[in-house]
């Protein structure tokens, strides 16, 4: 094959993994985004077949949901009866069929001792006799996955250990003092130069590896020929290898997208994997045993069938071939996969029915928005729903939902951050750069102070990572670090307060301004700032997305959000998902400043949006771990705006109290918070030993697009993404299309990230925080040699060892609009329609007559 063909092959195969950004900029990803051209059920069966990963909720999760009344058994039985009515098997009686179904539907595992050793031997022999053509039906997987050493170790596990070692050396983000030699030449080139010295390979293996082709594409072609992989199976073969370590493959994928010198990094990764697999399989010094994975699966299928029809092995062997085949057909039709799918569908339908009941519990009435003294725009994040609900109950306050990046496609450059950060959804590239700047004299002092502090930390790290100085370091730093450790452990709030006071006194960040106006910079790849017309259009678009084009209150608060936590590698996962894993206060401030400018308001007036002179925009940040509003931009206020602001600040302590009381009640191991939930929330966020500072977006379940009035009187339990939308102001459907293409997609990615981390935590999660190791500065491993764990930690989705807190159900999108709007959306938005048709998301609508409809 040509070099371009090999690169294209890898490019096509990467559909099975997702790009993994460094943990410092963690953003939720849909693990199956590249597989959505197939249905959810098809992907589930395929993953179970090729990787033994089950992405349906397991039996214990389902039984727990039933006991918690989250699954209505009537809904499940209705669906089961409907499917059973269409099934006919003439070789089996209804009694036989019903006996199997009634047992199999409960997903019980085979009881220990049900089959003895002789039973298993007889069944294994029967399977081998009756499935002689198994080789034609084997899935295309890495050959090393079905080969074992004489000690019982899978060869692919040995291969993975090699890949983990080399991968973490290459992707190291300056965490190590010594970096991988020749890294600047590329992964394959650097590996090829070093692997010939690797003592874990035999002398013969090192010799083979030393004489591999110099180009990664040539090495892949050579390995394919040596391994005997047919051309039509090559993409599937590469996919199998990428799925073996999806975390390390994912970080390679991300780097190939973001760093021009690593554009073919994934090709290098595949070349190294195939080359190592080739030499391991050709090792004549090790006895290798090959097992048929297909026959193993068939054996398990027959065992499960016999267990559920209550038949022993002798009875099975005495059945006629026709009767055996009939039972196998029954077991295939009503397999564990079938029942898991049915249970998940019933769980989702139960939740939807209860959501409908809650929304329609109180009649929807349009309120007079002009009566609101303050309008507050919050991110759609589910954590804002309880806060908004409590805020609205305390006075004339209207809350609005919009994605936290406020429709601004920017890369932000903040004063106290080393690197620029895209502040928009990860699937969108930034189009502009906005810089924060301050007075030159103040910045000079601030930079000097910051340089002094960073120099101290740099020298500390330098001493720690060098042999001789590291022996002296404990003597020098021990007393100070001991005091800091004791303070952070016993008095976390006080320790944090001391650090904060120190920062305020010695590292006080100057008040920053933003480069809103267009500036010229020959070295910037992105235009800095906006032209006046761009400011007008972005402001207009944001106001339209908020459904805020008339009836303005005297004070409008644009609320970004962030999260406070201490000693938390996953801090970015608690930030704004719509801003790519960063706090969204920057975007809120930028939009507020633009909307206050006279020339922008004049331009908006020409566009039909008349903002009263007494109306003022301010910016705040909702701290989700303590449920407080931090005001980050408050310009001079008009009398009307000041009165409204005073009223807002007056009720805020009560709102924070109620929001924290509700939120902390769901966290395990929390002290009684009735007296002072705010203090408990701050203690929780300050505690560096706390593995669960907040639940994040756990239990997210629906995305509701419509007027606030349809949910204003409902308690949605912090499970709903809420986005304002008025279909009467969107005749061409452009606003709805924008919401579906951006915020709804982000919500789906978040939903499936939580889903995957709950149903398959060993593969899509990242294990317990207490045993994680931050690796190469880019992610975490369990111990010192695992896959790069790219999902959410156990503490983000589990209540305890046995009970999941997150409910693994797929996102329900509810749109308040006439049927014609939904039909138009599905017709023109192919990507969204595919998600609905293939059951990656669920879709419902509330029409102009307030009627609910499932699509």
UniProtKB/Swiss-Prot annotation:
<dbReference type="GO" id="GO:0008270">
    <property type="term" value="F:zinc ion binding"/>
</dbReference>
<keyword id="KW-0862">Zinc</keyword>
<dbReference type="GO" id="GO:0005886">
    <property type="term" value="C:plasma membrane"/>
</dbReference>
<comment type="function">
    <text>Part of an energy-coupled inorganic carbon pump.</text>
</comment>
<feature type="binding site">
    <location>
        <position position="561"/>
    </location>
    <ligand>
        <name>Zn(2+)</name>
    </ligand>
</feature>
<keyword id="KW-0472">Membrane</keyword>
<feature type="binding site">
    <location>
        <position position="576"/>
    </location>
    <ligand>
        <name>Zn(2+)</name>
    </ligand>
</feature>
<keyword id="KW-1003">Cell membrane</keyword>
<protein>
    <recommendedName>
        <fullName>Probable inorganic carbon transporter subunit DabA</fullName>
    </recommendedName>
</protein>
<comment type="similarity">
    <text>Belongs to the inorganic carbon transporter (TC 9.A.2) DabA family.</text>
</comment>
<keyword id="KW-0479">Metal-binding</keyword>
<keyword id="KW-0813">Transport</keyword>
<dbReference type="Pfam" id="PF10070">
    <property type="entry name" value="DabA"/>
</dbReference>
<dbReference type="InterPro" id="IPR018752">
    <property type="entry name" value="DabA"/>
</dbReference>
<comment type="subunit">
    <text>Forms a complex with DabB.</text>
</comment>
<feature type="binding site">
    <location>
        <position position="381"/>
    </location>
    <ligand>
        <name>Zn(2+)</name>
    </ligand>
</feature>
<feature type="binding site">
    <location>
        <position position="379"/>
    </location>
    <ligand>
        <name>Zn(2+)</name>
    </ligand>
</feature>
């Amino acid at each position: 094959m040509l070099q371009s063909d090999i690169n294209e092959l890898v490019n096509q195969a990467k559909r099975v993994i997702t790009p993994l950004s460094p943990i410092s900029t963690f953003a939720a990803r849909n693990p199956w985004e590249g597989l959505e051209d197939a249905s959810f059920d098809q992907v589930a069966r395929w993953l179970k077949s090729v990787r033994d990963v089950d992405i349906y909720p397991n039996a214990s999760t389902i039984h727990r949901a039933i006991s918690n009344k989250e699954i209505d058994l009537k809904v499940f039985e209705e669906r089961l009866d409907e499917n059973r009515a269409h099934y006919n098997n003439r070789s089996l009686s209804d009694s036989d069929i019903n006996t199997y179904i009634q047992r199999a539907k409960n997903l019980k595992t085979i009881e220990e001792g049900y089959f003895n050793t002789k039973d298993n031997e007889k069944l294994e022999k029967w399977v081998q006799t009756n499935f002689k053509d198994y080789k034609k039906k084997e899935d295309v997987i890495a050959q090393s996955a079905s080969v074992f050493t004489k000690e019982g170790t899978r060869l692919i596990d040995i291969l993975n250990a090699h890949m983990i070692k080399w991968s973490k050396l290459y992707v190291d983000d300056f965490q190590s003092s010594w970096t991988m030699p020749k890294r600047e030449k590329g992964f394959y080139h650097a590996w090829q130069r070093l692997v010939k010295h690797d003592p874990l390979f035999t002398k013969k293996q090192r010799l083979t590896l030393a004489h591999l082709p110099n180009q990664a594409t040539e090495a892949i072609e050579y390995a394919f020929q040596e391994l005997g992989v047919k051309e039509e199976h090559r993409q599937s073969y590469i996919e199998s290898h990428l799925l073996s370590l999806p975390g390390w493959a994912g970080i390679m994928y991300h780097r190939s997208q973001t760093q021009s010198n690593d554009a073919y990094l994934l090709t290098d990764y595949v070349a190294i994997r195939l080359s190592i697999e080739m030499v391991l399989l050709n090792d004549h010094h090790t006895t290798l045993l090959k097992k048929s994975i297909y026959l193993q699966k068939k054996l398990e299928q027959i065992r499960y069938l016999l267990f559920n029809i209550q038949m022993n092995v002798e009875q099975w062997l005495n059945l006629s071939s026709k009767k055996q085949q009939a039972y196998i057909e029954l077991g295939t039709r009503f397999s564990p996969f079938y029942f898991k799918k049915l249970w998940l569908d019933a769980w989702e339908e139960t939740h939807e029915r209860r959501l409908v009941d809650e929304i329609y519990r109180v009649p929807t009435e349009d309120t007079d928005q002009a009566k609101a003294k303050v309008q507050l725009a919050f991110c759609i994040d589910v954590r804002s729903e309880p806060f908004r609900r409590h805020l609205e109950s305390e006075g004339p306050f209207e809350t609005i939902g919009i994605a936290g990046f406020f429709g601004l496609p920017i890369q932000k450059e903040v004063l106290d951050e080393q690197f620029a950060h895209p502040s928009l959804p990860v699937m969108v590239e930034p189009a502009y750069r906005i810089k924060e700047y301050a007075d030159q004299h103040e910045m000079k002092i601030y930079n000097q102070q910051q340089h002094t502090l960073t120099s101290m930390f740099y020298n500390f790290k330098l001493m720690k990572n060098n042999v001789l100085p590291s022996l002296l370091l404990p003597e020098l730093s021990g007393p100070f670090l001991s005091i800091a450790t004791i303070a952070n452990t016993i008095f976390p709030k006080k320790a944090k307060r001391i650090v904060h006071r120190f920062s305020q006194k010695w590292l006080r960040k100057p008040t920053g301004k933003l480069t809103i106006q267009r500036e010229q910079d020959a070295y910037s790849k992105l235009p800095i700032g906006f032209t006046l017309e761009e400011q007008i259009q972005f402001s207009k678009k944001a106001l339209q997305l908020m459904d805020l084009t008339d009836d303005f209150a005297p004070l409008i608060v644009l609320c970004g959000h962030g999260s406070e936590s201490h000693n938390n590698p996953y801090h970015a996962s608690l930030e704004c998902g719509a801003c790519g894993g960063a706090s969204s206060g920057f975007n809120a401030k930028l939009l507020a400043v633009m909307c206050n400018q006279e020339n922008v308001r004049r331009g908006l007036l020409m566009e039909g949006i008349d903002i009263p002179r007494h109306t003022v925009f301010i910016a705040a940040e909702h701290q989700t771990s303590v449920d407080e509003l931090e005001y980050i931009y408050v310009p001079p206020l008009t009398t009307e705006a000041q009165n409204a602001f005073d009223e807002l600040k007056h009720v805020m302590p009560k709102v924070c109290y109620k929001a924290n009381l509700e939120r902390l009640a769901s966290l395990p191991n929390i002290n009684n918070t009735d007296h002072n939930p705010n203090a408990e929330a701050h203690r929780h966020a300050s505690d560096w030993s706390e593995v669960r500072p907040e639940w994040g977006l756990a239990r997210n379940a629906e995305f509701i697009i419509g007027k606030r009035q349809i949910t204003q009187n409902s308690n949605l339990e912090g499970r709903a993404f809420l986005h304002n939308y008025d279909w009467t102001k969107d005749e061409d459907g452009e606003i709805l299309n924008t919401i579906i293409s951006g915020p709804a997609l982000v919500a789906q990615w978040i939903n499936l990230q939580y889903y995957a981390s709950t149903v398959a935590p060993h593969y899509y999660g990242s294990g317990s925080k207490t045993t994680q190791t931050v690796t190469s500065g880019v992610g975490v491993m369990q111990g010192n040699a695992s896959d790069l764990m790219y999902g959410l930690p156990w503490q983000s989705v589990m209540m305890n060892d046995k009970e999941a807190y997150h409910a693994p159900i797929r996102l329900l999108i509810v749109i308040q609009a006439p049927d014609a709007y939904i039909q138009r959306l599905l017709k023109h938005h192919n990507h969204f329609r595919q998600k609905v048709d293939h059951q990656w998301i669920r879709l419902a609508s509330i029409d102009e007559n307030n009627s609910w409809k499932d699509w």
